């Protein structure tokens, strides 16, 4: 039996948006069963709600952004990843600005926030999206694919012509569970190259970026004094992003995901392609007295 989950208590955080550079106040609130993840722009009059829905994705350049009723919510992927990692189904995310705080560039601070708020089980079974048929999308040599699998596993391969990202450190696989997510994925930070800085600034991107919230590389090395948290932190962060992007499907995935040089745009294209093909997936749940789901979530954390 795996039940839906929400937060036990309301919790708040503040930070800056990675791309906007704006200070933002964020409040995470409990939500009822079947509510899902809903963002709320409390700085707007009237307040606008934006569901965490792959069909509302309008921005995929260096982040995943949603738009609903004229209101934007930018850089949702790291919080969505943490929610997926801890199995939180229902939550209200109030924001005082259009972009979520970047924190340290990983999902670790969001994991800590969620655990600090406490996570409680609710009265209805959790709903999973079970992959029944292979679905694949491509963009040039980039590939993102879902395949049937008993559980949830993710594999990712990146290709960067950089001495700090050799081929042997460009591949990562994870058999998803809360424990594996927290230990192996959640601390991996977003990264960027000095050579791309001008391109980003011209487009008003990365304005809040610094070595406090990203790994920064020049042509030869990592510039952060503390170095890397994992030897292959770069590809692990790509899995972190993918877990967040895929959670916009509206439920936890049961299947195998494979990404080759994929990013936010292709991940979103994959989710949309899946949802559009009704023969390729089904809703499943595991009510009391039935089989256990093939994915392990940590016991609820009662704060």
From Swiss-Prot:
Keyword Ribonucleoprotein in record: no
UniProt binding sites for Zn(2+): 78, 237, 241
Any matching Pfam family: LpxC
GO process annotations (BP): lipid A biosynthetic process
Cellular component, GO, one term: membrane
Gene Ontology terms for molecular function: metal ion binding; UDP-3-O-acyl-N-acetylglucosamine deacetylase activity
SUPFAM superfamilies xrefs: Ribosomal protein S5 domain 2-like
Enzyme class: hydrolase
Pathway(s) it belongs to: Glycolipid biosynthesis; lipid IV(A) biosynthesis; lipid IV(A) from (3R)-3-hydroxytetradecanoyl-[acyl-carrier-protein] and UDP-N-acetyl-alpha-D-glucosamine: step 2/6
Protein's UniProt name: UDP-3-O-acyl-N-acetylglucosamine deacetylase
């Amino acid at each position: 039996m795996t039940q839906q989950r929400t937060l036990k208590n309301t919790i708040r955080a503040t930070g800056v948006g990675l791309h906007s550079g704006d200070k933002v106040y964020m409040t995470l609130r409990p939500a009822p069963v079947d509510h899902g993840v809903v963002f709320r722009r409390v700085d707007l009059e009237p307040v606008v709600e934006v569901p965490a829905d792959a069909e509302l994705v309008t921005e995929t350049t260096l982040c995943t952004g949603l738009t609903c009723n004229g209101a934007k919510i930018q850089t949702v992927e790291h919080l969505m990843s943490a929610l997926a990692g801890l199995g939180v189904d229902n939550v209200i995310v109030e924001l005082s600005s259009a972009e979520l705080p970047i924190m340290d560039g990983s999902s670790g601070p969001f994991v800590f926030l969620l655990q600090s708020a406490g996570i409680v089980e609710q009265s209805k079974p959790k709903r999973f999206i079970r992959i029944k048929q292979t679905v694949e999308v491509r963009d040039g040599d980039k590939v993102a694919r879902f395949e049937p699998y008993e559980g949830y596993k993710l594999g990712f391969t990146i290709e960067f012509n950089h001495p700090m990202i050799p081929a042997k450190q460009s591949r990562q696989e994870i058999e998803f569970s809360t424990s594996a997510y927290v230990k192996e994925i959640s601390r991996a930070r977003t990264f960027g190259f000095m050579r791309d800085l001008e391109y980003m600034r011209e487009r008003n991107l990365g304005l809040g970026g610094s070595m406090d919230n990203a790994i920064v590389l020049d042509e030869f090395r990592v510039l952060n004094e503390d170095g890397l948290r994992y030897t292959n932190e770069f590809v692990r962060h790509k899995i972190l992003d993918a877990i967040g992007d895929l959670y916009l499907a509206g439920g936890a995935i049961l299947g195998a995901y494979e990404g080759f040089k994929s990013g936010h745009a292709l991940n979103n294209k994959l989710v949309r392609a899946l949802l559009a093909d009704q023969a390729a997936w089904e809703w499943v749940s595991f009510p009391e007295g039935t089989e256990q789901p093939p994915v392990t979530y940590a016991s609820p954390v009662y704060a």
